[in-house]
């Protein structure tokens, strides 16, 4: 039985020079910018050259059921499946993934580079500083906030109201103490005193913009369109009104270029951008996915959290910005997560419990049927854990197949690409089937109708209840003429409802809309439901307690 940790496996794997990985996808030396021997950015010369290639590969979206707090191995499946298609089926394959946020690495969830023998490497670099994209974003976020505060202090000819500034500062750390602060305290020499707050870097609008921008000009335009706040005369003020878009774009110009790394089995992987799926759109950058589509025959990408969050947002929003729609959808399921959805105690998830599995199956059933309603072929992959019994695995596969869906059991974590060759064959076969894409809502639908259609069709809510604050914000959005934008619903990842403890597949509940936020630069409206936080906190035993580094700089304890 394998007892090696993820980081031990990664550190004991021989990497290929990143130049050789680039050659696998026909990138010339002048089309990459090296970050040491194992990481690179694809240059603008490379990106512009790739765009001329008319070829478009098959796009495979990997999503999942509602997760347990520890996650269900979606990234592991994405990486392992990509390795299997490339190295076992010998097809030209690329993986496109989000880059991890550093905050959760030291918190509860840990890193986001896969696990076991299905990882992207160098895992410690990717999980920590990588190529500096997150630091560039944090600098851009806080520079913009500082410029706005300085504008109010120095001139403020537009009479921007310091109490109606919508921008948040950013830091890529889980720190609950920064959710609400007061700045400019003391004398006026320290600035204008007003309340402010921090969001984790990946929750900031600039992260969404980085992931949606198609080039530097588009990046600059989107930054200029960010709504800063309102004047004392109730007029909206945008970044372009203050003239800061050029400086902020300059800070992000290098971060906009996608990063190239490899898997343990040397499959090329583009890792770029990382918005959360519960509070943003939850997909890697458009530049990364489009670049991958032009470079390979098969591209695997994932959508954050469950199919009700990242999956829905990918289908209804992200795919509108890509060069093509998904050709197939993979829904990742685990035995333990379905037992959790049956309200089984986390202390007993490793014990065989067929009745709990059957009860929890309702959650998977809804997710896979929701994805099928988009008109794209769907397959379920069961991520096998050591604690799963054969009876549980076979029962789950039977339940899925009885509902009319393809299903395979995979063990990429323990076996690498050999842990799911038949699954890879079936996924490739599915991409060749005809699809008839049907979004949940139409672009011309009103904001209320878009929210209602997602709530009814995806969540199975009975009704929607708007807070007084949300009603006021909706009226402001309509007054500005921005109510034609897509909606991104911010919701707990653990439930179809806005309450994380209501598990399974609930019906006929009320979805509570707490507030709405116009993300004008990104081009969507965030609809906050329940108690959603954009600045996480740390748990009682943070992962940081288990992380260390020796005198040779070798890091241990990352997972």
UniProtKB/Swiss-Prot annotation:
- N-terminal signal peptide: none
Name the pathway. Answer: One-carbon metabolism; tetrahydrofolate interconversion
Gene Ontology terms describing biological process: tetrahydrofolate interconversion
Record SUPFAM superfamilies: P-loop containing nucleoside triphosphate hydrolases (SSF52540)
List the InterPro entries hit by this protein, alphabetically.
Answer: Formate_THF_ligase (IPR000559), Formate_THF_ligase_CS (IPR020628), P-loop_NTPase (IPR027417)
Which is an annotated GO molecular function term of this record? ATP binding
Which family does the record assign? Belongs to the formate--tetrahydrofolate ligase family.
Protein name, UniProt field:
Formate--tetrahydrofolate ligase
> Species name for this entry?
Lactobacillus gasseri (strain ATCC 33323 / DSM 20243 / BCRC 14619 / CIP 102991 / JCM 1131 / KCTC 3163 / NCIMB 11718 / NCTC 13722 / AM63)
Recorded name of the encoding gene = fhs
């Amino acid at each position: 039985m394998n007892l090696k940790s993820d980081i031990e496996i990664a550190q004991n794997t021989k990497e290929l020079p990143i130049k050789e990985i680039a050659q696998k996808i026909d990138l010339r030396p002048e089309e990459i910018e090296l970050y040491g021997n194992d990481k690179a950015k694809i240059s603008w010369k490379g990106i512009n050259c790739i765009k001329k290639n008319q070829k478009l590969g098959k796009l495979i979206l990997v999503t999942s059921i509602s997760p347990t707090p520890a996650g269900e191995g979606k990234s592991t499946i994405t990486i392992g499946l990509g390795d299997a298609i490339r190295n076992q089926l010998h097809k030209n394959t690329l993986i496109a993934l989000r880059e991890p946020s550093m905050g959760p690495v030291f918190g509860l969830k840990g890193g986001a580079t896969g696990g076991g023998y299905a990882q992207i490497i160098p895992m410690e670099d990717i999980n920590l500083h990588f190529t500096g994209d997150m630091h560039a974003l944090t600098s851009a976020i806080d520079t913009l906030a500082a410029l706005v505060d300085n504008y109010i202090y120095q001139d403020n000819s537009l009479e921007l109201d310091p109490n109606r500034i919508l921008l948040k500062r950013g830091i890529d750390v889980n720190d609950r103490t920064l959710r609400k602060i007061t700045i400019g305290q003391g004398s006026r020499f320290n600035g204008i005193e007003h309340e402010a707050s921090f969001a984790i870097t990946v929750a900031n609008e600039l992260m969404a913009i980085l992931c949606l921008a198609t080039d530097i000009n588009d990046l600059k335009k989107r930054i200029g369109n960010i709504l800063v706040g309102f004047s004392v005369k109730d007029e909206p003020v945008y970044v372009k009104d203050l003239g800061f878009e050029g400086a902020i774009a300059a800070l992000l110009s290098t971060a906009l270029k996608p990063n190239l790394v490899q898997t343990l089995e040397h499959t090329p992987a583009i890792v770029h951008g990382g918005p959360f799926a519960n509070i943003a759109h939850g997909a890697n950058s458009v530049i990364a996915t489009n670049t991958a589509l032009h470079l390979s025959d098969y591209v695997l990408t994932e959508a954050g959290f469950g199919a009700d969050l990242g999956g829905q947002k990918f289908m209804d929003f992200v795919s509108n910005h890509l060069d093509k729609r998904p050709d197939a959808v993979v829904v990742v399921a685990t035995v333990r997560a379905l037992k959790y959805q049956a309200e089984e105690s986390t202390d007993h998830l490793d014990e065989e419990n067929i009745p709990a599995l059957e009860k929890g199956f309702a959650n998977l059933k809804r997710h896979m049927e929701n994805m099928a309603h988009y008109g794209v072929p769907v397959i379920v992959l069961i991520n096998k854990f050591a604690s799963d019994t054969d009876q549980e695995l076979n029962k789950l596969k039977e339940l899925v197949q009885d509902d009319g869906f393809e299903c395979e059991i995979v063990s990429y974590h323990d076996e690498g690409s050999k842990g799911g060759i038949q699954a890879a064959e079936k996924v490739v076969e599915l991409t060749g089937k005809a699809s008839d894409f049907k979004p949940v809502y139409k672009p011309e639908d009103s904001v209320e109708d878009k929210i209602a259609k997602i709530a009814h069709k995806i969540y199975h809510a009975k009704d929607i209840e708007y807070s007084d604050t949300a009603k006021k914000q909706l009226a402001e959005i309509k007054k500005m003429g921005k109510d034609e934008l897509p909606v991104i619903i911010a919701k707990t990842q653990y439930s179809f409802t806005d309450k994380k403890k209501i598990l399974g597949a609930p019906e006929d509940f009320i979805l509570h809309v707490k507030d709405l936020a116009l993300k004008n630069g990104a081009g969507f409206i965030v609809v906050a439901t329940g108690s959603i936080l954009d600045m996480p906190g740390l748990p009682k035993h943070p992962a940081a307690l288990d992380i260390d580094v020796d005198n040779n700089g070798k890091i241990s304890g990352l997972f």
